[in-house]
Amino acid sequence: MLSAVLCLGLLSPEIRDSDFWWHLRTGQYIVETRSLPVPDPFAYTTAAAPSAYAGEDAVRRFNLTHEWLAQALVYAAYRAAGFPGVVMLRALLLAAFCGLAGWVAWRRSGVLDRGWMAGLAAAAIAVPFALDRPQLFTYLFLALTMAILESRRRLWLLPFLFLIWANCHGGFFLGWVVLAAYCAEALVARLRHRPLAEERALWLCSAGAVLASGINPNGFRAVQVLLLYRSSAMQSYLLEWARPALWPPPLFALLLAAAAGTMVWARRTVRMSDWLLLAAFAAAAFIAERNTIFVGFFAPVFLASYLPWKRALPALAGWVAAAALAAGIVWGATAGDFFELRAAEWRYPSGAADFLASHQVTDRMFNTYEYGGYLMWRLWPRERVFIDGRALSERVFDDYARILYNHDNAGGKNAAQLLDQYGANVIVMDTFEYATGTVYLLAPAIATTAQSEWKLVYRDAQALIWMRHPPAGVTPLNPMEVFSQMEDACGLHLDREPGRPRCARSLAQSYAKIREFTRARRWLGIYLDHPHAPDPEAEQAYREYVNAGK
């Protein structure tokens, strides 16, 4: 019970994912119109976007439709219980994923202690994945698939499970991998004249599950689309599709190494299906950061299965473990990190959305990628967005990057020409990519360029609004307030996420470029005062500022 409460607490942070908002709006659209969002009703750039590569139209349709059931369920949770309902739905889905890891580990090892420890190990890996996205259903259904296959009871449920899964998220093909591993094990056992129990039911139900997963808006295109994802330049910009960093060793890599080592040690007793699953999901984890959560399921299960020591913990150790779990629950509750049944409004441009809504602005806008979903939720149908996290068009994304980073004419149209081409009369943007600290150069470029076309009409710590034609009664702000906004924005993120200080480094560089050396030194000092990777270049620059008295 204590481990279950701890898991729920760990997996219930506030809603902090920018993609959540477009999933929520899409779910509302599906529920209220009883139709799929095809063609795209939310972004004005989608319809006219030319295909950048063969197959992009199929990818676009897939991205618009493959999560429809999960999106409708998330919206239903929101409509029933607001943001607390969404947070608890996510926590329960992930806790069930971890609980199934514990159940399978317990069933295989026969040791209850191994079960709850495997569940907690899965939870430790799952914490960064506590995001309100449809792939939560893939995590749960993958775990359910293995649990059903392990018990060999109710194999007839597999086709129904895969039917639901294939309409919640395109990751249902990962279930095929699990089915294939168990079917291959059964086939080899049959060839060795040692047939496994329920082998006929296993093959029939697995075949039924694969066929049932084709009953969705895209049929069996998920694998084709995945291959197209890997060749997409746009996907290469998304951090979740990047290969995971392996130094210092992350927790998933340590668990994977421990599981692999244990299986090699016990190789004579390791099941064929386990070797296949370890290899398949280890490969997936090394290909993309987003896949590392699956190691959090399989590695603890395999560790519990093959560790040679089978005894339960001594009574004293059990009491110590219970005390540690209770202390963790108390710490999380008192620190305010557990059961945060709200949206992290500080991350989103709520003030900017209020401004646009109150002035009934309907002009086309250019917006930053991470704000597209929130603006879609707040402003549609009066306003449609330029871009959002659905990643629907390679060409639009290329133009977006040229505008955002204020590219010149080299290699294509410059930012001003592209804004004219798209008919954008409003710009809603933040000024940093906080993971890397990269400055979005468009805003400081507009502020420091002699021009009268764009007026700064709104700014707070979350967003800036520039307009060509401000509403009546709105007095433009001093464009140099962009730099004050950048300071406010970076300061807010440092308060909330002190482990991501690179915006301060980039802000120092921005001030150095306009010869504001006092401010450059101040922000470089702030960066160096926060946790950061070794950065001799920044340390040298700071010493030079100090020695020069700047």
Regions found by a protein language model. Give the residues of each.
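C-terminal luminal/periplasmic domains and tails of membrane-associated envelope-modifying transferases
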Residues: D337-A343, R347-E370, W380, R384, ...
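Short acidic/glycine- and proline-prone juxtamembrane loop motifs at membrane-interface regions
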Residues: F129-F137
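Short hydrophobic/aromatic helix or loop-helix immediately within or flanking a transmembrane segment
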Residues: T45-P84, M88
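Transmembrane-helix motifs of polytopic, lipid-linked glycan transferases
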Residues: M88-S109
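Signature aromatic-anchored transmembrane alpha helix within multi-pass, membrane-resident enzymes
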Residues: S206-V210, V301-G332
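Membrane-interface alpha helices of multi-pass inner-membrane proteins
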Residues: C7, A122-A126, A143-I148, W156-G170, ...
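Membrane-interface transmembrane helices that cradle and orient dolichyl/undecaprenyl
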Residues: A143-W156, A259-T269
